[in-house]
Amino acid sequence: MNILVIGNGFDLAHKLPTRYNDFLGFVERFLNIINTPQILQQGELKNTEKTVYKYIDHLIFNEQQLCKELEQLVKDNIWIEYFLQNPMYQKENWIDFENEISKVIQSLDQDMFFKDGEKSELSEKMQNLSNPFLHKKYSKYTAAMRTASALTHGKGESITYKEIRDRLYNDLNKLIRALEIYLTDYVEKEECNCVLPDIQEIVKENVKGADGEEQIKYCKVLSFNYTNTYERLYLDKQQIQNSIDYIHGKAKLFNTVENNNMVLGIDEYLTDERKDRETEFIAFKKFYQRIYKETGCKYKDWVETIREEYDDFLQEKERIINRANEYVGNDVQRMMHRLQASAVRDQKCKMHNVYIFGHSLDITDKDILRELILNENVYTTIFYLNRDVMGQQIANLVKIIGQDELIRRTGGKSKTIEFKPVSYTHLRPHETDQYLVC
């Protein structure tokens, strides 16, 4: 079995604008335009040389219903506000949604603790917020402001932690739906004639069927992306796409906020002791969203097949060796059994292949990557863009499988992991960090 694992670097290698900052830049332009009456009165945009402006022009003046939906999703969206004012985005045009969301959620979670270590209930009034953005946004609801109002005989306003949590969650779902519109109505309609040699070699192979005739066998694909890039460039239209597992969901234009199944969340940050007890913010976590949104998990079946095959191999090997050790018949038969056992001892199990392309091996996907890589009958090839990217992938892999396991699997007779440079490198040097994001 061949399994191809793809992250956002796969889409970037096909010159598609799928970085978070690409999307955020689009939203920023969209908001600026719809909030400028003079432009709307013109009936068209004057400058549409950049494809993103060409799309915005088409969206505003030709797709009014979709435009209205997008406006409702991004206008006054607390996450859009937070990302746009983020210093990293403002100074370097770079942002990691998942990391930033995690910072906000963890700060709010921590704010619920009293000085004595006890945690307040979600239904209780918010006292203070440590995140600078949230503190500024909800400053009039803090305990200090309520006290100040009371001193002037005013009535201080209050808000509960639950109300803040729910606003963050609802606006996250709106953000995800807005991203879905961007990907399906813009990115997936972008012309893309770039096909990667490395992927072409992996996608399909000629095998003999039960009737002896040659057939084309397509590899399994585990996609961490929301887009259909792999399907439209590497699969024939008549091919059934049941070999693709969209682990983080798949973008579809005519979805809604309610039935969208795209996963955009955070990794577990609580200790083992706390994570099963404190579930106030569980809806923001990736594992929860995968279950709740019923995204793909076909890879589980692939892993099970791989492990069952290895178990069967070991059992058969043990059976042959035990038979040789226990045989008490004539010398010729005993010799034959021992020769067979000797041959079996050195025999290797049939290997399956996992190819990882455009994925940073970030620890947020640790559980999935471990299931694929940590099998004795799996050979993993990790593609890298340059030596800097390779170095980062090695560092991330240590966090996923551990230093000792990585050393064992990258050298000697037990080698099952190798790093391989990509054959296709149209990305410019300054884009390599963005290539890492999955």
Listing of model-derived features with the role each one plays in the protein:
Residues 3-9, 219-225, 283-368, 380-386:
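Glycine-rich anion-binding loop/nest that anchors nucleotide
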Residues 1-34:
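An N-terminal structural lobe/cap that precedes and organizes the functional/catalytic core
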Residues 425-434:
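Conserved small/polar residues in nucleotide/adenosyl-binding loops
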Residues 437-438:
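Hydrophobic alpha-helical segments, chiefly the membrane-spanning helices
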